[in-house]
Amino acid sequence: MEQLKLRVRNGICICFTAQGKETATRLLEKLSQQMEEAFDFLDYTGSEHSKPLKQVVKEAFQEKEAILFVGAAGIAVRLIAPWVRDKLKDPAVLVIDEQGRYAIPILSGHVGGCNAVSYT
């Protein structure tokens, strides 16, 4: 777990449903004890948002070291697809199911520390 603290300094967590929001909240509480900086949290369960989700993901790819999606892997893959460029530069992308039982590293598993996050 110490490896996670050293490698991932900033990130964003995005959820799409009420169950995903509960899981994301629990996960972020656990991660906050291990990280130097807290993850940003975006709740996309409602209809009112300051930015379109595609724009948020684009900005996250440019600014964050890690993106956690709590929800369907298909949604995450479609959202990140336009921005994927290089395994050494892209942020770690992790998808966690809504119940919090399974974590799938999508990008930057070894290089970006995504595999380490998936074991928490």
Predicted regions and their residues:
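N-terminal beta-loop-helix "entrance" segment that forms/cooperates
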Residues: 41-60
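Short, flexible, glycine/charge-rich loop motifs used to bind or transfer phosphoryl groups or to couple energy/partner
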Residues: 3-4, 57-58, 83-84
